[in-house]
Amino acid sequence: FATKFILEYAEQFPKLRFNMLSPSDVPSFLEGKADVICLSAQAQLSNCIMLPRGRMIFVPVATPQYLKEHGPINHPDDLLHHRVFSNLYPNSFSLNSNYQLTKKGQSCSFQAIDTIRYSNVEMTRRSVLEHAGIAPCMPLFFIIDDLEAGRLVPVLGGWHRPSHQNYVVCKDDDWKIRQIRMFSNWWAQKLGDYEKECEARLIKLYGRKFFLNLIH
């Protein structure tokens, strides 16, 4: 979806050049090496404009084939018996990931010592689609097509990583530059609209009750 959106903007402003990096590198952004950055659940950054771009909703998933071969996964304790593919990265070289999971007012912490951990969410998705394990916290917007096609299904019986706000961020000084301000506003609106579309599609698939549980 990001490619489609960027191409749309590039067609309107053909002289602009885009260099897209993933995952986001906050230190490099603060050093002035990037004009705009997408962040999730970050504390307020000083001297920055933070534009809301929708909610980050996480869905724990596996493939139907994996569940058929390994049995149901209904509780965080079940994760101990499965390969967990993580795209959390407390630092670049740590294999330890601490999952904060919640369900209907309850919460628990799961400490995963990942044998395979990715800093790129697409690699996590591919590993799960290859029936190699489960992903406890996949972003909804990244897997909504897979959910609709039945390639992935929710697991953990309603337990999930808490949702949080997403932002498009630029520095105060850059906000004064019309080109950067225009793109930042447009990008935040596009991403926010897409998040809402994904939420509506999820409700159509699993119902409003399922959705409401994920956003708390």
Name each model-derived stretch.
Residues 15, 144-145, 149, 159-216:
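C-terminal effector-binding regulatory domain of bacterial HTH transcription factors
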Residues 83-106:
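Secondary-structure junction motif
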Residues 1-46:
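Central regulatory/effector-binding core of bacterial HTH transcription factors
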Residues 48-55, 62-87:
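Flexible hinge/capping segments at coil-to-helix
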Residues 13-21, 106-115:
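A local structural motif
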Residues 107-154, 159-161, 176:
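Hydrophobic hinge/microswitch elements
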Residues 24, 40-42, 62-64, 137-141:
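Beta->alpha turn/N-cap motifs
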Residues 32, 43, 51-62, 78, ...:
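Short Pro/Gly-enriched coil loops immediately N-terminal to beta-strands
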